[in-house]
From Swiss-Prot:
ATP binds at residues 35-37, 41-47, 231, 261-262, 269-271. It catalyses: tRNA(Gln) + L-glutamine + ATP = L-glutaminyl-tRNA(Gln) + AMP + diphosphate. GO terms for cellular component: cytosol. The keyword Phosphoprotein does not apply. This is Glutamine--tRNA ligase. Gene3D superfamilies: Glutamyl-trna Synthetase, Domain 2 (1.10.1160.10), Glutamyl-tRNA Synthetase, Domain 3 (3.90.800.10), HUPs (3.40.50.620), Ribosomal Protein L25, Chain P (2.40.240.10). The gene is glnS. It comes from Yersinia enterocolitica serotype O:8 / biotype 1B (strain NCTC 13174 / 8081). One of its GO terms (biological process) is glutaminyl-tRNA aminoacylation. Keywords: Aminoacyl-tRNA synthetase, ATP-binding, Cytoplasm, Ligase, Nucleotide-binding, Protein biosynthesis.
C-alpha cells in the first residue's frame, strides 16, 4: 500500500473536513514549532508527520517555526539539526524558516496594548513569593500587592525592564486574569521575564523575553495558522491561548486542538532526561543509535519511510497510551525486508578448511535480494578456507538443529554442500578450526544421489573477508516505563550495546552510512556514520530479523 493510498483518518482531519465544507476556512495552514533546545525525537516525528502530512494532503501550507524565546537553553546547533531532521523525514516547509524572535517587536507592542487595557502589570514578587501566592489545585491564589498599579506606572516599569533596569528575577510582566481561577494557567500567568543572555538570532537587542503561552498564540495568528495542533499537556493552556488573542488587536484567531503525545515503551521522551543521558555519558551523544532521537534512529539505520509508517499506524487520538517498541521495530523490519540488499557477515567467526578443494578463488553470482531481481546481483568469492559463525556448528546435536554437525552436511548459502569431518581444538578445548569436505557438484543444486540437506548457513571467504566491528544495539532500558522509576538511570540495560569483531564479504567495502543491509540470518545493519571507513568498517545493528526481546525478558 502506498502512502497516498494509506491516507489516515482521525478526529483532526474530520474537523478540517468540516471547516472546509462549511467555508470557515478555504485552505489549511499548519505549523511545526519546536524549541531549539535539543534534538528531535520519535515523539516529535509524530507531530511532524501530522502537521506536514495534513498540509500535503489538503494542498495547504505548513510552516517550520522555531519557538526561540529562551536564549539560555537554545543553540544554532539544534536549529540546524531540526531542519535536517524535518527534511530527512521527507517534508518541506512553506516559505522561509520562521522564528518566534522574528516577532519580538510585535509581541512587545501587544504586551503594551494589554497594559493599556489594564490587563497586564509589572510584578516584583520574588519567584518564591509568586509560587506561594499562586495557590494550589484545591486552594485559590491571592493577588500580588503590585497587581493594582496604574497603567502609567506599569508602562514605565515595563520600559524599564526592556532597558535593563531590573536584575533577573526581580520583575516580570503578568497577565491580569483571575487568581481564583480553577485553572492554574489562568492565575495571572507571566508574559515576559528578564534574561540577560545573547540570543542566537537577535543578539543582545533584548533582555526581556516573552513566555511560550504569550508567544505561541500570537505567532500562530501573525502567520495565519488555521489549525494549531498541540499535545494534550497544552489542553488547559488553550484557555490562555484564546484569552490573549481575544484581548489584543489582531484579526486572525486560530483554533488550538490537542492530541495525545507518543509514549514509547523502553524509552524516554523528556529532553531533560535525554540530556542527562548525554551529560552523564551513558550514551555517546544525542545521535547515539540507542537514543530515540531522529538523528540516533537515522544513524542506527532506520529509514524515513519506516518512521512515517510508524506514525501512520499509531494514529492520532485524544487518549494517552503506551506504544510497544515492537510496533516501531515492525515498521523498520517490513521496510528493510522489502528494500535492503542482502550481504553475508560472520559475527563470531570459526575457520573452516575444505580439504578436498584446491586452493584458489571462485567468484559466485548471488542475488542482492531473493525476491526482487531488479536489485541485481553481486560477485562473492569462494575459496578453500572460509569463516562460518560459531553458533552454526556443534559436535553433537539433536534433529532440531539444522546447521553443521560433526559427520553431517549443511549447505552454504548460494554455494556448495559441505560435510564436517573433524575439528581442531585449543588447550582449553575450544574448537579453533573445522576440517570439511565439499560436494563440487552441488553449486546451487541438490546432491545428484538424492540425499537431503536441510540446513543453510552463511559464510565468507577467509582470504577476501573484510574485518569489521559489529555493534549489536538493543533497547537502552530494561523496563517498559523507565520514566516511572525513582532513578531512571538505574534501569539502563547493561547489554544495550555489545561489540563483536567479525568479518564481512568484500562487497561491503564501500558501504555508506544510512544504507542498510540485511546480513543474512543475522539482522539488518548499516555502516556507522561517525566511525566506519573503508579500512576500518563499523556496522550498527538496526534491528534483528525477529523480535527476541520477549524471550530475553522471560529468561
Amino acid at each position: 500500500m502506498s502512502e497516498a493510498e494509506a491516507r489516515p483518518s482521525n478526529f483532526i482531519r474530520q474537523i478540517i473536513d468540516e471547516d472546509l465544507a462549511s467555508g470557515k476556512h478555504t485552505s489549511v495552514h499548519t505549523r511545526f514549532p519546536p524549541e531549539p533546545n535539543g534534538y528531535l525525537h520519535i515523539g516529535h516525528a509524530k507531530s511532524i508527520c501530522l502537521n506536514f502530512g495534513i498540509a500535503q494532503d489538503y494542498q495547504g501550507q505548513c510552516n517550520l517555526r522555531f519557538d526561540d524565546t529562551n536564549p539560555v537553553k537554545e543553540d544554532v546547533e539544534f536549529v540546524e539539526s531540526i531542519k535536517r531532521d524535518v527534511e530527512w523525514l521527507g517534508f518541506t516547509w512553506s516559505g522561509d524558516v520562521r522564528y518566534s524572535s522574528d516577532y519580538f517587536d510585535q509581541l512587545y507592542q501587544y504586551a503594551v496594548e494589554l497594559i493599556n487595557k489594564g490587563l497586564a502589570y509589572v510584578d516584583e514578587l520574588t519567584p518564591e513569593q509568586m509560587r506561594e501566592y499562586r495557590g494550589t489545585l484545591t486552594a485559590p491564589g491571592k493577588n500580588s500587592p503590585y497587581r493594582d498599579r496604574s497603567v502609567e506606572e506599569n508602562l514605565a516599569l515595563f520600559e524599564k525592564m526592556r532597558a535593563g533596569g531590573f536584575a533577573e528575577g526581580t520583575a516580570c510582566l503578568r497577565a491580569k486574569i483571575d487568581m481564583a481561577s480553577p485553572f492554574m494557567v489562568m492565575r495571572d500567568p507571566v508574559l515576559y521575564r528578564i534574561k540577560f543572555a545573547e540570543h542566537h538570532q537577535s543578539g543582545n537587542k533584548w533582555c526581556i523575553y516573552p513566555m511560550y503561552d504569550f508567544t505561541h498564540c500570537i505567532s500562530d495568528a501573525i502567520e495565519g495558522i488555521t489549525h494549531s495542533l498541540c499535545t494534550l499537556e497544552f489542553q488547559d493552556n488553550r484557555r490562555l491561548y484564546d484569552w490573549v488573542l481575544d484581548n489584543i488587536s489582531i484579526e486572525c484567531h486560530p483554533r488550538q486542538y490537542e492530541f495525545s503525545r507518543l509514549n514509547l515503551e523502553y524509552s524516554i521522551m523528556s529532553k531533560r532526561k535525554l540530556n542527562l543521558l548525554v551529560t552523564e555519558k551513558v550514551v555517546e551523544g544525542w545521535d547515539d543509535p540507542r537514543m530515540p532521537t531522529i538523528s540516533g534512529l537515522r544513524r542506527r539505520g532506520y529509514t524515513a519511510a519506516s518512521i512515517r509508517e510508524f506514525c501512520r499506524r499509531i494514529g492520532v487520538t485524544k487518549q494517552d497510551n503506551n506504544v510497544e517498541m515492537m510496533a516501531l521495530e515492525s515498521c523498520i523490519r517490513d521496510d528493510l525486508n522489502e528494500n535492503a540488499p542482502r550481504a553475508m557477515a560472520v559475527l563470531d567467526p570459526i575457520k573452516v578448511v575444505i580439504e578436498n578443494r584446491a586452493a584458489g578463488e571462485e567468484w559466485l553470482t548471488m542475488p542482492n535480494h531473493p525476491n526482487n531481481p531488479d536489485m541485481g546481483t553481486r560477485q562473492v568469492p569462494f575459496d578453500s578456507e572460509i569463516y562460518i559463525d560459531r553458533a552454526d556448528f556443534r559436535e553433537e546435536a539433536n534433529k532440531q538443529y539444522k546447521r553443521l554437525v560433526l559427520g553431517k552436511e549443511v549447505r552454504l548459502r548460494n554455494a556448495y554442500v559441505i560435510k564436517a569431518e573433524r575439528v581442531e581444538k585449543d588447550a582449553e578445548g575450544h574448537v579453533t578450526t573445522l576440517y570439511c569436505s565439499y560436494d563440487a557438484e552441488t553449486l546451487n543444486k541438490d546432491p545428484a544421489d538424492g540425499r537431503k540437506v536441510k540446513g543453510v548457513i552463511h559464510w565468507v571467504s577467509v582470504k577476501h573477508a573484510l574485518p569489521a566491528e559489529i555493534r549489536l544495539y538493543d533497547r537502552l532500558f530494561s523496563v517498559p516505563n523507565p520514566a516511572a522509576a525513582e532513578d531512571f538511570l538505574s534501569t539502563i540495560n547493561p547489554e544495550s550495546l555489545i561489540i563483536r569483531q567479525g568479518f564481512v564479504e568484500p562487497s561491503l567495502a564501500d558501504a555508506v552510512p544510512e544504507k542498510t543491509y540485511q546480513f543474512e540470518r543475522e539482522g539488518y545493519f548499516c555502516a556507522d556514520s561517525h566511525y566506519s571507513r573503508p579500512d576500518a568498517l563499523v556496522f550498527n545493528r538496526t534491528v534483528g530479523l525477529r523480535d527476541t526481546w520477549a524471550a530475553k525478558v522471560t529468561n
